Amino acid sequence: MKMVYLGLFLIITSCVISSGNLIYECKWADSIRLKDKNPTHEFCKKKCEEKNTDRITVQHGFHSSDYRCTCQGEKILETPYQSDGVKDCHRI
């Protein structure tokens, strides 16, 4: 009986180890507070691209208030579990 349990344990462990991380493409939005008033859309897009690197695509960067830029786009997220804050995403 112990051999059966050991065999099941090894099979389950190997499946978990081999599954690895899941990869998701997610929509994201962020904002950047600035020192200068009334930034242009071009300035905001540049700031969004500078701030958001590492597997992130900036689709829009625009002036949203007197001292703030809003950034939107997509990012690639690798996670072992779907419950790790994965929202507004689809698996790729």
UniProtKB/Swiss-Prot annotation:
Tissue and organ distribution: Expressed by the venom gland.
Annotated signal peptide: 1-20
GO molecular function terms noted in the UniProt entry: potassium channel regulator activity; toxin activity
Subcellular location as annotated: Secreted
Keyword Disulfide bond applies: yes
Transmembrane segments: none
Post-translational modification: Contains 3 disulfide bonds.
Primary location: secreted
GO cellular component, one term: extracellular region
Keywords per UniProt: Disulfide bond, Ion channel impairing toxin, Potassium channel impairing toxin, Secreted, Signal, Toxin, Voltage-gated potassium channel impairing toxin
Highest taxon of the lineage: Eukaryota
Family: Belongs to the scoloptoxin-15 family.
Function text: Inhibits voltage-gated potassium channels (Kv) (IC(50)=about 10 nM), when tested on DRG neurons.
Name of protein: Kappa-scoloptoxin(15)-Ssd2a
